[in-house]
């Protein structure tokens, strides 16, 4: 049964304003969540406008199905497949804006049964879509120690990754972990130096969650697809919550804002240069939440909004 967990949408107005909504435009909300961005987009669309929302969380889909609006449709699936969804609807090159609000949502964190939080004891799951793939518990019980250490180091930037991985494997040999509290306790015991501002399990939980949900690969694929589906002048409005996400978004926007890089002195005709094409995006900058928003919603503190526009190239 789905509880009514409160969710405060971060950078709500800024992210939607970044789309530069046209009343008759076609937009994608790739991370519906609890519908904060979608509802604001719908309020700015005219009768001819359309909004396609995507989410892989069944609880988000249940919320989306309560929206009775002919301009709105919801897809249960990963946003990495947005290119397929757009192609199926014959909308390639016709999308006027894509919004992505990355990472885990407050309702997912606050619901102990989802297994995302070390602050609330629940099943060690962490899947955005609990109907697909391996849970965190299943992966940790079958993965090699070296693989766990790599994930913790790469996706959690955890400096004690090897020690924690060893402790996880040893604990699972004795008795397989199935609860978030068990993992949090194992990590805390294996961490020799504690950060007084951060729970010792913070980085491990982030890393395992990112790995279980292939989050960074999802982002990279969605960004790649966006170039094909956006209309000239179409906008990308993307909110990230940690450096790994933001690094991917920043690099993508920077690289596609430069156009093809031709080595100095390489002899090329004007025709050859035309075939290489020009830049595909124009980066429009970044925004961060103000002090007032952070005070009202501490989880907004680390968020970064980046906006870019598709060029005619």
Curated annotation (Swiss-Prot):
Name listed for the protein in its UniProt record: Ribosomal RNA small subunit methyltransferase H
Organism: Escherichia coli (strain K12)
Subcellular location: Cytoplasm
Disulphide bonds in the chain: none
Annotated Gene Ontology cellular component terms: cytoplasm; cytosol
Catalytic activity: cytidine(1402) in 16S rRNA + S-adenosyl-L-methionine = N(4)-methylcytidine(1402) in 16S rRNA + S-adenosyl-L-homocysteine + H(+)
Role description: Specifically methylates the N4 position of cytidine in position 1402 (C1402) of 16S rRNA. In vitro, active on the assembled 30S subunit, but not naked 16S rRNA or 70S ribosomes.
Keyword terms, alphabetized: Cytoplasm, Methyltransferase, rRNA processing, S-adenosyl-L-methionine, Transferase
Any one GO BP annotation for this protein: rRNA base methylation
Enzyme class: transferase
Amino acids binding S-adenosyl-L-methionine: 35-37, 55, 79, 101, 108
NCBIfam families in alphabetical order: 16S rRNA (cytosine(1402)-N(4))-methyltransferase RsmH
Keyword set includes Cytoplasm: yes
């Amino acid at each position: 049964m789905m509880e009514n967990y409160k969710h405060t949408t971060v950078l709500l107005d800024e992210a939607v304003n970044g789309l530069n909504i046209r009343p008759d435009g076609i937009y994608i909300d790739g991370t519906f969540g609890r519908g904060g961005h979608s509802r604001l987009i719908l309020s700015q669309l005219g009768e001819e406008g359309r909004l396609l929302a995507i989410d892989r969380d069944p609880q988000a889909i249940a919320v989306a199905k309560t929206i009775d609006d002919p301009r709105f449709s919801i897809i249960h699936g990963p946003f990495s497949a947005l290119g397929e969804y757009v192609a199926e609807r014959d909308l390639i090159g016709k999308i006027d804006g894509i919004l992505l609000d990355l990472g885990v949502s407050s309702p997912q964190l606050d619901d102990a049964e989802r297994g995302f939080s070390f602050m609330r004891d629940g099943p060690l799951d962490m899947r955005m879509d609990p109907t697909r793939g391996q849970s965190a518990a299943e992966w940790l019980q079958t993965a090699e120690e070296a693989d766990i250490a790599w994930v913790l180091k790469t996706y959690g930037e955890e400096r004690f990754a090897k020690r924690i991985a060893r402790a996880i494997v040893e604990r699972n040999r004795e008795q397989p972990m199935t609860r978030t509290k068990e993992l949090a306790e194992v990590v805390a015991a294996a961490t020799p130096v504690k950060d007084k501002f951060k729970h010792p399990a913070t980085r491990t939980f982030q890393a395992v969650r990112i790995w279980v949900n292939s989050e960074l690969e999802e982002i990279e694929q969605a960004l790649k697809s966006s170039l094909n589906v956006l209309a000239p002048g179409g906008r990308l409005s993307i909110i990230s919550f940690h450096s790994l996400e933001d690094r991917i978004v920043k690099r993508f926007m920077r690289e596609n804002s430069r156009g093809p890089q031709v080595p100095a002195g390489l002899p090329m005709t004007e025709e050859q240069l035309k075939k290489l094409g020009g830049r595909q995006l124009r980066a429009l900058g970044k925004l961060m939440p103000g002090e007032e928003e952070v005070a009202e919603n501490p989880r907004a503190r680390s968020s970064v909004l980046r906006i870019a526009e598709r060029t005619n190239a």
